[in-house]
């Protein structure tokens, strides 16, 4: 390879990189692709009109996409995409997209006009205009966020109400009657009743009276009744013991006589 050929190769590489970096080659490729599609589309129309055969290029997407594009939602979807391509001035891409979607040229404009009138969107185009697809997407996202926020707040309110209702139905119990009552001896013999049980009872009684400040009224009544019952039993035990002692003394005096 001589010097001239080497210099031309370097120049070609430099020009190609520069055009690629500035997007000129991408635009040329898109324009060439669009021109090829337009030529094939015109040929398809001639074949379809003259021979009634299905076109070779129109509707080249899959079956699911064709069914979607035939529905009202699919037509609106294609129209929003075409409106965005037109807004971004991707004209060559738009020329390729429409034939592949089996949609007529500029048919998306009527769809966009009807959608804008029904939903209150403005179609005035200026430097600060935004694509309609972006407005629809942002509106959907705002609605989803509002739904989640409202759902979360309502869920928290329902949980709060349920917890309050549970607290109302089941109030906290400070203590039960069995826990609040003083620890008394279950069985007391007659001999023990007159002895050490008296001091123990007084100690339990003082402890019980100290704890009655925090007792409910019903527990206090039950405790008072139990206290009276125990006092009555102790009185009867002491009385019987005193009578036994007195009877024994009388018998001894009679024996002496």
UniProtKB/Swiss-Prot annotation:
Enumerate the UniProt keywords alphabetically: Cytoplasm, Cytoskeleton
Q: What happens when the gene is disrupted?
A: Extreme defects in morphogenesis, positioning of mitotic planes and cellular organization due to dysfunction of the cortical cytoskeleton and absence of the preprophase band of microtubules. In the ton1 insertional mutant, the two highly similar genes in tandem, TON1A and TON1B are simultaneously disrupted.
> Could you tell me where the Basic and acidic residues compositional bias lies?
201-212, 244-257
Q: Name one GO biological process term.
A: preprophase band assembly
Tagged with keyword Protein biosynthesis = no
Q: Which Gene3D superfamilies match?
A: 1.20.960.40
Biased composition regions of type Low complexity, renumbered to the chain: 187-199
Give the residue ranges for region: Disordered.
148-216, 231-257
Task: Describe its assembly.
Answer: Interacts with CEN1, LNG1/TRM2 and LNG2/TRM1 (via C-terminus).
- UniProt-recorded name of the protein: Protein TONNEAU 1b
Question: Which organism is the protein's source?
Answer: Arabidopsis thaliana
User: What gene is it encoded by?
Assistant: TON1B
């Amino acid at each position: 390879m001589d010097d001239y050929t080497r210099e031309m190769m370097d120049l070609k590489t430099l020009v190609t990189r520069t055009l690629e970096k500035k997007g000129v080659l991408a635009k040329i490729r898109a324009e060439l692709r669009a021109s090829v599609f337009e030529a094939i589309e015109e040929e398809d129309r001639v074949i379809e009109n003259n021979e009634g055969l299905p076109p070779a290029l129109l509707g080249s997407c899959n079956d699911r996409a064709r069914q979607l594009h035939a529905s009202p939602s699919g037509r609106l979807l294609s129209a929003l995409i075409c409106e965005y391509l037109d807004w971004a001035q991707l004209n060559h891409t738009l020329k390729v997209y429409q034939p592949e979607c089996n949609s007529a040229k500029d048919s998306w404009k009527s769809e966009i006009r009807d959608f804008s009138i029904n939903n209150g969107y403005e179609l005035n185009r200026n430097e600060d205009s935004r694509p309609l697809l972006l407005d629809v997407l942002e509106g959907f996202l705002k609605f989803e966020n509002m739904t989640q926020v409202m759902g979360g707040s309502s869920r928290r309110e329902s949980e709060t109400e349920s917890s309050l209702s549970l607290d109302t139905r089941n109030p906290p119990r400070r203590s039960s009657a069995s826990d609040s009552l003083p620890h008394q001896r279950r069985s007391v013999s007659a001999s023990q009743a007159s002895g050490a049980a008296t001091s123990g009872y007084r100690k339990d009684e003082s402890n019980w009276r100290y704890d009655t400040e925090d007792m409910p009224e019903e527990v206090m009544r039950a405790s008072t009744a139990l206290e009276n019952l125990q006092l009555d039993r102790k009185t009867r035990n002491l009385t019987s013991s005193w009578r036994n002692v007195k009877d024994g003394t009388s018998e001894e005096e009679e024996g002496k006589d």
